[in-house]
Amino acid sequence: MPFSNYIYEYYDGISSGNITVGKWVRLLYEYIVKGLQEGLFTFNAKKANKAIRFIENFCHHCEGRTDLLKLELWQKAAVSVMFGIVEEDGTRVFREVFIVIGRKNGKTLFASAVIAYMAYLDGEYGAKIYCLAPKLEQANIVYDNFYQMIKKEPELSDLSKKRRSDIYIEESNTAIKP
């Protein structure tokens, strides 16, 4: 399967006017694409597409029919930025990501899928992943959604243990907390 660079594909859509985004998103992708072209950033398509494939093959909707997720182009581009843009030693350049998404557009589901990838396949032993929000109740929504998501996938569920204060993955010594 050939690797795609969804960052360029998304940026091309923005540049051509086929995809409408705000000023800050346009500037961000201009910066990223320029950085890739000038060698400021290194793009590892294998890492980016590994994250995308994981999300689309192991992460389920938690309500309704519980189908597997199918990421939209902007989500694939965002995941590519998060996991595919790396330093020469392979560490991620963007370690913190701020994404603004309108109401009822899948923020919780997308965040849960990214958490799932980081917890199960990112390769960081002893990771501590926190669901943060202005209120604990909001953080618990993402945490609970993540838990429901992994319960739908036996391969992930078998590796996980729900404890009183977290979800623990013994194989990687990883804990996910609200």
Regions found by a protein language model. Give the residues of each.
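Phosphate/NTP-binding elements of NTP-utilizing enzymes
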Residues: 1-178
